[in-house]
Amino acid sequence: MSEKKKSFFKKANKKNAAAENLSAAERAKAADVEEIVSPMRQIVNNFMSRKLAVGAMVLLIVMFITMFVGPLFMPKYSDSYTDVTQQNIPPTMSLASVPGELKNDIKMIDGYGTFTVGLSNSGHVYIWGSTKIGTTGVDVANIPADLPQGNIAMVAAGIDHVVAIDNDGKIWCWGNKKLGQYGTEAEVLAAGGEVNPNIAYFPQELADNGVVLSEVKKLTCGYQASAILMNDGTLYLWGNKNGYKNFDLFLAAGAMYDMDFTLNYIVGVNGRRNSIFTGSRGLYDVVRPNVGAKSVKIATYLDGRTIEDVVTTNNSLALILSDGDVCFAGDFSSDAVKAPTLGADEHYVDVVGGAMHYTGLTNKGNVYTWGRNNLDQCEMPGKTTGVSKIYGGSFQSYAVDENDDLVSSWGLKG
């Protein structure tokens, strides 16, 4: 290689080495300078580095979507819906959970509020649902230790108490008793209390002598009130008089053929079985052949037929007539499901009422449910064949076969 070429390559190598040394120096200098980041980006970086904060943000977003977007996919949901019988309920999915020991030996089931009471043919009482009564500290699942399990004949559930009658005619009550749900006036005075004029105390006659079981036509409970109707029309009524606008009228009323409680009124069927007694003129003087149908005067609709049974919800009543027809009075929500139109050879043999719905059983063994469906009260399961008895809770229905086995249940589970 010529001296000229050697000189050229030598100079080139020196330049490359200088360039490499300069780049290394610049890189070292740059490393000593802190990277400039915008304040917003710094906030985001700090937040994303905290796993707990990120998790909380994700949870907040999910809650927002559930609250504001979820209802768009829930057509039955209403943020304005309230029900006085369903207040102060802790989380539960047991509202329709019939105990296993009762499922194949059902004599009767009854419910009014957040819990349901059942009775087996062997005379044992069972209670399920949300059994703790609000903030009272009372739990209706605490059945009295001296209750003669295996010897109970009838049971009924109120909003916060239970009434039972044993085979000897003795009446048993438990639950909340602060507003006269049970307990005689003499017991209050003996305990040093004062008589409350707004309470109709448990009749002393019943406390002393009980009832003749074969003469009991109906045992029923309402909102902090209870009643026993005898076959001869005698009505024993006790509880919180402030809960019903016509309580005193029924205390003084004569014989009744049938009676029941709505949320605000006591309703009765007179001895002639051709009208509804409430003590308020015009309250139930008209009836409808179906939910939402045009009202007609009750005398016109009956046309010689008589009332066999009265069944109630919170705001309405259903009358089962002597020919198996059913008509209605009172208030229904605008979205209520209508009762089905039965064929000429089909009629109702039983109807039970919940808080806002009815369930009916026909002579053909078909079961139908109608009324408000906001909590799936009318969402019947497919298997409802072979049914011979029906029972109702506040937002539940129960179908039982001729062997007293539970066929199906539906409605609000929790």
PLM feature spans:
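Gly/Trp-centered helix-boundary motif
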Residues: 2-131, 135, 151-158, 252-259, ...
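Short glycine/serine- and acidic-residue-enriched loop/turn motifs that recur at repeat junctions
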Residues: 75, 79, 98, 126-148, ...
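Short coil/turn segments that connect the beta-strands within blades of beta-propeller domains
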Residues: 113-114, 123, 159-160, 169, ...
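Conserved core positions of repeat-based scaffolds
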Residues: 115-118, 127, 161-164, 173, ...
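Repeated scaffold domains used in trafficking and secretory/extracellular systems
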Residues: 152-154, 216-218, 253-264, 306-309, ...
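Ankyrin-repeat and related helical/solenoid repeat scaffolds used for protein-protein interactions
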Residues: 384-414
